[in-house]
Protein backbone atom coordinates (compact mmCIF):
# COMPACT_ATOMS: atom_id res chain seq x y z
CA UNK A 1 0.00 0.00 0.00
CA UNK A 2 1.41 3.39 -0.97
CA UNK A 3 1.97 6.04 1.71
CA UNK A 4 -1.00 8.09 0.44
CA UNK A 5 -3.24 5.02 0.38
CA UNK A 6 -2.14 4.15 3.91
CA UNK A 7 -2.93 7.69 5.07
CA UNK A 8 -6.37 7.58 3.41
CA UNK A 9 -7.06 4.21 5.01
CA UNK A 10 -6.70 5.62 8.55
CA UNK A 11 -10.22 7.14 8.71
CA UNK A 12 -11.65 3.89 7.33
CA UNK A 13 -9.82 1.87 9.98
CA UNK A 14 -11.00 4.29 12.68
CA UNK A 15 -14.59 4.02 11.44
CA UNK A 16 -14.40 0.22 11.54
CA UNK A 17 -12.95 0.24 15.04
CA UNK A 18 -15.05 2.97 16.67
CA UNK A 19 -18.30 3.64 14.80
CA UNK A 20 -19.15 0.48 12.91
CA UNK A 21 -20.06 -1.54 16.02
CA UNK A 22 -22.45 1.25 17.09
CA UNK A 23 -24.21 1.93 13.78
CA UNK A 24 -24.39 -1.70 12.74
CA UNK A 25 -23.53 -3.53 9.57
CA UNK A 26 -26.22 -2.30 7.22
CA UNK A 27 -24.43 -1.24 4.06
CA UNK A 28 -26.56 -1.40 0.92
CA UNK A 29 -23.76 -2.98 -1.07
CA UNK A 30 -21.63 -6.07 -0.90
CA UNK A 31 -18.77 -5.73 -0.01
CA UNK A 32 -19.44 -3.08 2.62
CA UNK A 33 -18.24 0.45 1.92
CA UNK A 34 -15.33 0.15 4.35
CA UNK A 35 -14.22 -3.19 2.86
CA UNK A 36 -14.55 -1.66 -0.62
CA UNK A 37 -12.43 1.32 0.46
CA UNK A 38 -9.66 -0.85 1.89
CA UNK A 39 -9.58 -3.05 -1.22
CA UNK A 40 -9.65 -0.07 -3.61
CA UNK A 41 -6.81 1.64 -1.75
CA UNK A 42 -4.76 -1.56 -1.64
CA UNK A 43 -5.39 -2.40 -5.30
CA UNK A 44 -5.21 1.04 -6.94
CA UNK A 45 -3.23 3.25 -4.56
CA UNK A 46 -4.13 6.57 -3.01
CA UNK A 47 -5.32 8.62 -5.97
CA UNK A 48 -7.46 6.19 -7.96
CA UNK A 49 -8.40 4.15 -4.87
CA UNK A 50 -9.42 7.33 -3.06
CA UNK A 51 -11.53 8.42 -6.03
CA UNK A 52 -13.24 5.01 -6.27
CA UNK A 53 -13.91 5.10 -2.52
CA UNK A 54 -15.40 8.59 -2.68
CA UNK A 55 -17.68 7.62 -5.57
CA UNK A 56 -18.82 4.51 -3.70
CA UNK A 57 -19.59 6.39 -0.48
CA UNK A 58 -21.59 8.99 -2.41
CA UNK A 59 -23.67 6.20 -3.99
CA UNK A 60 -24.43 4.57 -0.64
CA UNK A 61 -27.59 6.31 0.58
CA UNK A 62 -31.23 5.27 1.14
CA UNK A 63 -32.25 6.17 -2.42
CA UNK A 64 -29.16 4.64 -4.04
CA UNK A 65 -28.64 1.23 -5.54
CA UNK A 66 -28.02 -2.11 -3.87
CA UNK A 67 -26.27 -5.35 -4.67
CA UNK A 68 -22.78 -6.53 -5.43
CA UNK A 69 -20.35 -3.75 -6.35
CA UNK A 70 -16.81 -5.08 -6.54
CA UNK A 71 -13.71 -2.94 -6.96
CA UNK A 72 -12.86 -2.74 -10.68
CA UNK A 73 -9.58 -4.24 -11.89
UniProtKB/Swiss-Prot annotation:
It comes from the Bacteria. It is found in: Cell inner membrane. Pfam families: YidD (PF01809). Keywords: Cell inner membrane, Cell membrane, Membrane. It is a peripheral membrane protein. GO terms for cellular component: plasma membrane. InterPro entries: Membr_insert_effic_factor_YidD (IPR002696). The keyword Membrane applies. Belongs to the UPF0161 family. HAMAP family: UPF0161_YidD. Could be involved in insertion of integral membrane proteins into the membrane. This is Putative membrane protein insertion efficiency factor. It comes from Dinoroseobacter shibae (strain DSM 16493 / NCIMB 14021 / DFL 12).
